[in-house]
């Protein structure tokens, strides 16, 4: 039973981590394109998702803070 639960949790966490990384990449892409408005929108979309993953324990709160600080 524990093995099944662990696998289910691992897949769920992998999905959430992938989603978070995608949002972060979108911010980097928008910044690289030079479109300030798109970059701001991408950052505003990314910020609550990163915070939520830190609250849920997927990443450490300091890592979430570092991602946000590096992208501001």
Swiss-Prot record:
Keywords from the UniProt entry: Ribonucleoprotein, Ribosomal protein, RNA-binding, rRNA-binding
GO molecular function: small ribosomal subunit rRNA binding; structural constituent of ribosome
This protein's GO CC annotations: cytosol; small ribosomal subunit
Domain of life from the UniProt record: Bacteria
Any Pfam family the entry gives: Ribosomal_S20p
GO annotation (BP), single: translation
Its biological purpose: Binds directly to 16S ribosomal RNA.
Family membership: Belongs to the bacterial ribosomal protein bS20 family.
Alphabetical list of PANTHER family matching this protein: 30S RIBOSOMAL PROTEIN S20, SMALL RIBOSOMAL SUBUNIT PROTEIN BS20C
Protein name in UniProt: Small ribosomal subunit protein bS20
Species: Proteus mirabilis
